[in-house]
């Protein structure tokens, strides 16, 4: 079991996708995302294997949840700055975590 203090260390914040494009340099099909986390963090870049259910142009303007306080991680030829969150379907394809109503970019999950 983790303690509540452990949960508090993880920053899960919401941001709006402002750019999305296919990552044609990745081994597995993925989408590069630029996410606006507002004044709190600004814009952050990541890559996620979302092509089963999402087209890049459909993601623009959508709000997504991401872990924002992991250190940057090399993913192929790019550096990922955040980890976008999702739940797996029956085949382990990610379904994004998104708020059902618009919220302020940078808002922290509690």
Residue ranges: model-predicted function:
Residues 1-110:
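Phosphate-backbone binding interfaces of nucleic-acid-interacting proteins
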């Amino acid at each position: 079991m983790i303690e509540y203090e452990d949960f508090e260390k993880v920053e899960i914040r919401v941001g709006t996708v402002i750019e999305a494009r296919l990552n044609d340099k990745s081994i597995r099909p993925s989408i590069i995302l630029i996410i606006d986390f507002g004044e709190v963090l600004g814009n952050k870049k990541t890559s996620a294997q979302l092509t089963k259910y999402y087209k890049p142009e459909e993601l623009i303007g959508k709000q997504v949840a991401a872990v924002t306080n992991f250190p940057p991680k090399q993913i192929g030829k790019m550096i990922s700055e955040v980890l976008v969150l999702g739940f797996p379907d029956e085949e382990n394809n990610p379904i994004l975590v998104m708020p059902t109503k618009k919220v302020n970019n940078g808002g922290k999950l509690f």
